[in-house]
Amino acid sequence: MAKKVVAVIKLALQAGKANPAPPVGPALGQHGVNIMMFCKEYNARTQDKAGLVIPVEISVFEDRSFTFITKTPPASVLITKAAGIEKGSGDSAKGSVGSISRAQLEEIAKTKLPDLNCSSVDSAMRIIEGTARNMGVAVSD
C-alpha cells in the first residue's frame, strides 16, 4: 500500500547551499522530517547548478519519510543571468535595464519547457519573452 502524504512543502533554495537554518529548518521541522538528510540530498542533487535558485517540492509522508522533486530555476533568475544584470527594472514601462538575444531567449525557453504549461519551444519563448518584458529586459533580434 502506498504511503499517505501528509504535507507538500515548496521552497526556493540556492543550489548546493541548503542548511538547517531558516527557511529550511522551520519548514521541515514542523513536519518531523530529518532536516540534515534533506540538506545533504538536496545539495548533492544541485551541486552542478551552483549560483542558481532551484525550487524544490518536498512530499512528507505520515511515517516522516520524504521525497522531493527539483524544478527548473525561475525564469527571472535565468533572464537576469543572461542579461548580466542584478535585478529587473522597478518600472518596466519607463525603459529597459538590459537586453538578451533571441538565441539566449530560446536557450532559457528550452531549459524552462518541462515546468511551463505548454508543449512547444515557440510558445515557451513567448512566455519567457513576456516575463523579460515585465522585468524591463529587451529582447533583440
Curated annotation (Swiss-Prot):
InterPro entries: Ribosomal_uL11, Ribosomal_uL11_bac-typ, Ribosomal_uL11_C, Ribosomal_uL11_C_sf, Ribosomal_uL11_CS, Ribosomal_uL11_N, Ribosomal_uL11_N_sf. PROSITE patterns: RIBOSOMAL_L11. It comes from Synechococcus sp. (strain CC9902). The lineage of its organism: Bacteria, Bacillati, Cyanobacteriota, Cyanophyceae, Synechococcales. Part of the ribosomal stalk of the 50S ribosomal subunit. Interacts with L10 and the large rRNA to form the base of the stalk. L10 forms an elongated spine to which L12 dimers bind in a sequential fashion forming a multimeric L10(L12)X complex. Keywords: Methylation, Ribonucleoprotein, Ribosomal protein, RNA-binding, rRNA-binding. It holds the Pfam family Ribosomal_L11. This is Large ribosomal subunit protein uL11. One or more lysine residues are methylated. GO terms for cellular component: cytosolic large ribosomal subunit. Forms part of the ribosomal stalk which helps the ribosome interact with GTP-bound translation factors. CDD domains: Ribosomal_L11 (cd00349).
